[in-house]
Amino acid sequence: MSHIKIGVSHEARRVGTLLGMLLIGTPSLLWAQTCTTQAKMTSDIRSGLSDAALRLAQAVQQGDGAKVQAATIAEFASASAFAPTLALVQATSSRLANDVLQVTQIYELDASSRAERDTSDADFSCPLTGTTSETDFAISGLPRGLYGFAMVETTGDHPWLLSFLLRQDEGVWKLAGFYPRARSTAGQDGVWYWKSARTYAKADELWLAWIFFGEADELLRPANFVSSTNLDRLRSERRAATPPELIGGMSSSHPLVLKSTGAQGPATEYRFTEMFADSSEDGKELNLILHVRADDLTDPAAVTARSRAAAQAMLDAHIELRQAFHGVWVFADSAGHEPVVTEQTISNIP
């Protein structure tokens, strides 16, 4: 699917590898971290971060894992430690083709005053010059050091954002984390999904609003540990539009339970653990993605039949979902097993 979020696994929707965040900790001090935005950093820092990020982005575009590995912080450049990043580079490279790369935002994150064995979040607040907005970082277990965060945009039919966490080692900026993210789903960007979500919310179509707000968040944030004034506003709007059944969230530990009663026999119960939007294989259509818990995957035919019934139960319970999606992909999940995927076109679901 074209909206894969980490490596080559659809399930790991949140993308990126953060290298070296495993230390035994003591509480951090509030003043231990500072952020300097692009407008206020020194020219040496600004050009150093920008050049390093662009070189890394070019290496990713070329699928040159060896070059990325050579520019990675030493403790995570061994073959075994670098393997997850290498897989991510290879999965991302094919999506960038001949896109033009441009460094669009950089931040200097100074954590040089953190305690030696601090594993708490390293919090950075970055007020943006001339505005009331800010960008915030909360990086778990960040080791002491001078860091930078750089965002490289790609242009093309399917734009991407390549974000890099860099650490300065002996005057050289090296890779400490890599976070590639698609910037569009089914040909639309995050702002479009945000506006559409607002429209659905006003129409009291809360299930569509909740999904579209979520997709806007997914497309607009550069990494899971980054927030901003705009993202906070988006998340507040999503909370306000959350359907009553989802107030407590939806997860493997807190599934959404739907029951379907057939003409004959007892009710069937479906436990949904995740629901979101995603592009079709060709990037042209928007599909609804459902993850449903399965106790047994040994009989593929039975799993497929159950997944089809689960999709119909969801669409019957929330008819508005039929209007926004081309198809439904159901992932039947069972612990310790690869999910069984069933695809249906909504027009073929009675």
What are the language-model segments listed below?
Residues 56-68, 197, 201-207:
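Short helix-adjacent coil turns
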